């Protein structure tokens, strides 16, 4: 009798749990208008991610954190082949570590120059390698992945000069620039766009495509609308990235090479922007979209409700849909 009651209680618990989960999924889909997994991922990000923050009362604490990151950045990173399960070559370009894979030695092969995010102070994560590899394998593209110099030890000018040397080498191998794609997320997205402006100033050929995932296009991060979005962003804090921007750019945070929102974007490759509304960079990305519209510049703007910073790198339905759509575009 007792065993039967225990079994009944167990079954009731399972059914109750299933009903609660089902109701939760239904609520998220109907009310939140997003996938359940995207909602769950956001909750987990709030629990486990520690955003970079700055307090005027404790400036030395921020300085210590940056110095700690800088020491780590002095150490070459491990070959990413363990993440992507393909053979990865490692090169040195003017002292800059560069990873290359899926190189068919074909001048007409598509090539992705991927510039990773991390507020210009962090090294790439597994997500960066797996994201670009997924796209590259789908379009049979060569990947060139530089570990560019970062703040606080290095400023943008030094990084641009090293990237220029890398790009000139790419142009020698890929004379058809219609095969070249710049791609980057967050700081790497802003860097991709800023670097394209830099190349235009040098009268160097432009890539065919600029694919920007949640790009940081105004590193001053002083848009008054940001405060309305910060409570919904588990990854970025305005105070932290605004402060770190000074180490990267120096005093002028609004000049176009570091804040491409304020640059002349005519004559560049086609720009594709992917941004979610649970991201403090959303207001500036919307301004970028409006600027491109006003100036009649060909671009693609994909805005996802309630998606987080660089949502395309998360294992969620919305990311899979948008990456697949991007793959189809890049195949053209």
Task: Cite the ranges covered by each PLM segment.
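A glycine/proline-hinged amphipathic helix-loop "lid/cap" segment
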Residues: 3-104
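Intrinsic disorder/low-complexity segments enriched in polar/small residues
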Residues: 1-7, 239, 332
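Alpha/beta-hydrolase superfamily serine-hydrolase fold, recognizing
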Residues: 23, 27-28, 32, 90, ...
